Structures are given as structure tokens and as C-alpha cells.
Curated annotation (Swiss-Prot):
InterPro entries: Ribosomal_uS11, Ribosomal_uS11_bac-type, Ribosomal_uS11_CS, Ribosomal_uS11_sf. HAMAP family: Ribosomal_uS11. GO terms for cellular component: ribonucleoprotein complex; ribosome. This is Small ribosomal subunit protein uS11. Belongs to the universal ribosomal protein uS11 family. GO terms for biological process: translation. The lineage of its organism: Bacteria, Pseudomonadati, Chlamydiota, Chlamydiia, Chlamydiales.
Length: 132
């Protein structure tokens, strides 16, 4: 009986938060595209990637997979009341522009598009050139 009371006490319902504005972080690498939607404080509301949406292997790096991932993340975020977003792009993958287009077409109002790609000031040695 003591265990039942402890279990009932610890269970809380997840409250649906109404967040009008947020930030979309799009990380477009050569192998995958990850879309994370946060509130202005940085707490994650929803996320999606090309792998999570169902693509695997070389299809994850396609622009269409990035579009589907962005639509999936936007739909989940709009269910919690999100309307207006700022977009931060990171990386040089194939899904950069297509992810932003998908966010706009899904009904989110995009106020700012920022390029946050990290550029080294001659940091690590780059990987060797690919010879095909």
C-alpha cells in the first residue's frame, strides 16, 4: 500500500505549453540533417532528423529527407502553440535551404534567418581530399 501511494504521488500529467515564438536550429551535415526547435530560453520543444523520419544510409543526406524532417518537427512544435520562429543554419549540407522552405510551407512565420556555421581560424587539420 505504501508503494501505491508513492507511485500515485510521483505521477504528473505533462502540461501543454503555449509558446508563441521560438528558435529553429538546422544542422545540415554531409550525412544527415537535424532540425531542433526550442523556446527562446533554449529548452527543446521538438526535434527531427532525416534518420528519425525513416531514411537510412545515403538517402539521409538528400534535400527531400531534410524537407520531411523539418515538416515533422514543425508539426510537433505547432501543436504546442508555436507560430513565429527564428532560423539558425549550421553546416553546408544538402538540406539547408530545403529545410527552411519546408518550415515556411508548414505554416510557421520565419522572422530571421541566421547563418551560424562554425568557421575555424585555422584550427584543426582538415581531412584528406577524396580521390574518386
Amino acid at each position: 500500500m505504501v508503494k501505491n501511494q508513492a507511485q500515485k504521488k510521483g505521477v504528473k500529467r505533462k502540461q501543454v505549453k503555449n509558446i508563441p515564438s521560438g528558435i529553429v536550429h538546422v544542422k545540415a551535415t554531409f550525412n544527415n540533417t537535424i532540425v531542433t526547435i526550442t523556446d527562446p530560453a533554449g529548452n527543446v520543444i521538438s526535434w527531427a532528423s532525416a534518420g528519425k523520419v525513416g531514411y537510412s544510409g545515403s538517402r539521409k543526406s538528400s534535400a527531400f529527407a531534410a524537407t520531411v524532417a523539418a515538416q515533422d518537427a514543425a508539426k510537433a512544435a505547432m501543436s504546442s502553440g508555436l507560430k513565429e520562429v527564428e532560423v539558425g543554419l549550421k553546416g553546408t549540407g544538402a538540406g539547408r535551404e530545403s529545410a527552411v522552405r519546408a518550415l515556411i510551407s508548414s505554416g510557421l512565420i520565419v522572422s530571421v534567418i541566421r547563418d551560424e556555421t562554425p568557421v575555424p581560424h585555422n584550427g584543426c587539420r582538415p581531412r584528406k581530399r577524396r580521390r574518386v
